[in-house]
C-alpha cells in the first residue's frame, strides 16, 4: 500500500531504518513535537522529599516500571499515569507516590516541580513524554534503547545507561536550561515546518497518469 508513495514519513531514525529494510523507498524523517507554551519551567512545590524522580505513562507490564521502582534513590519516586498494573504496583511499592492520570496544566506543573525524568521503558518507539519533560527543564534518565536514543541521541540533556540507577544520579548534574533549549528545537511549529518542507519536495504531476516524484534534499532543519 505505501511502497508506491512519493515519500513515507517516519517519526524516528530507528523506524526509518526498519522501513527501509522492509523495502520502503523515499523514507524521510518527520519527528513529533512538544507544546512549549504548556510545558515549561515554573516554580512549583509538590511538598515531597527531594529530589523528585517522576515517571509518566501508562501503567502496564511493557512499560518496565519495576526497573524504576526497584531503584534505591534519594528523595521521591513519583508515578503519574493509570493502567492495568497500577493496583499491583501500589501494593508492591508503598514507598512510591502514585498520582494516577494527570493531563494538561496539572501534568505540566508536576513536571516543573520535579528533578529528573525517569523513562524505564524498553519498547517505546518515540515517547512524547521525553520531550514534555525536557521542555519543563527535566534531564532524562533512561536505558540506551530505541525511543530515548532516537529522541536524545548524543545531546547532553540526559543519561542513557544500562544501569538505570547510575543514569538517575548522573542526570542530577545536568543543567536544566540545557534541556529547555533542546526542547525549543522540537516544538509542534518545528514539526509542522518539516512536514511542509517534505510536502514541497514532491514534484507536481505533469501529464495525466504521471507519478509525482519526491526530491530528497537531505536533512531538513525547521526554523
Regions of interest found by a model, annotated:
Residues 1-42:
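Donor nucleotide-sugar binding/catalytic pocket of nucleotide-sugar-dependent glycosyltransferases
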Residues 9, 45-74, 78:
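Conserved donor-binding/catalytic core segment of Leloir-type glycosyltransferases
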Residues 29, 88-90, 144-161:
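Short acidic/histidine- and often glycine-rich active-site loop of Leloir-type glycosyltransferases
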Residues 87-105:
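Nucleotide-activated donor-binding/catalytic signature segment of Leloir-type glycosyltransferases, i.e.
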Residues 101-102, 109-114, 195:
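Short alpha-helical donor nucleotide-sugar binding micro-motif in glycosyltransferases
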Residues 122:
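Aromatic "clamp/platform" in nucleotide-sugar-dependent glycosyltransferases that forms part
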Residues 139-142:
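Short hydrophobic beta-strand element within catalytic cores of glycosyltransferases
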Residues 173-216:
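A charged, aromatic-enriched C-terminal amphipathic alpha-helix characteristic of glycosyltransferases
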Amino acid at each position: 500500500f505505501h511502497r508506491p508513495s512519493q515519500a513515507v514519513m517516519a517519526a524516528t531514525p530507528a523506524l526509518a531504518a526498519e522501513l527501509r529494510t522492509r523495502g520502503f523507498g523515499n523514507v524521510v524523517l518527520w519527528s513529533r513535537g512538544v507544546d512549549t507554551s504548556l510545558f515549561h519551567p515554573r516554580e512549583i512545590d509538590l511538598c515531597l522529599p527531594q529530589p523528585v524522580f517522576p515517571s509518566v505513562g501508562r501503567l502496564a507490564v511493557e512499560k518496565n516500571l519495576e526497573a524504576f521502582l526497584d531503584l534505591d534513590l534519594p528523595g521521591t519516586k513519583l508515578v503519574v499515569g493509570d493502567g492495568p498494573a497500577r493496583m499491583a504496583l501500589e501494593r508492591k511499592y508503598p514507598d512510591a507516590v502514585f498520582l494516577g492520570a494527570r493531563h494538561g496544566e496539572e501534568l505540566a506543573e508536576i513536571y516543573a516541580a520535579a528533578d529528573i525524568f525517569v523513562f524505564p521503558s524498553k519498547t517505546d518507539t518515540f515517547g512524547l513524554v521525553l520531550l514534555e519533560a525536557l521542555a519543563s527543564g527535566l534531564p532524562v534518565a533512561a536505558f540506551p534503547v530505541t525511543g530515548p536514543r532516537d529522541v536524545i541521541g548524543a545531546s547532553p540533556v540526559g543519561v542513557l545507561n544500562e544501569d538505570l540507577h547510575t543514569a538517575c544520579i548522573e542526570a542530577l548534574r545536568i543543567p536544566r536550561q540545557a534541556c529547555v533549549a533542546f526542547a525549543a528545537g522540537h516544538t509542534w511549529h518545528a514539526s509542522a515546518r518539516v512536514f511542509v518542507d517534505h510536502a514541497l519536495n514532491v514534484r507536481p504531476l505533469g501529464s495525466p497518469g504521471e507519478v509525482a516524484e519526491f526530491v530528497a534534499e537531505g536533512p531538513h532543519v525547521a526554523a
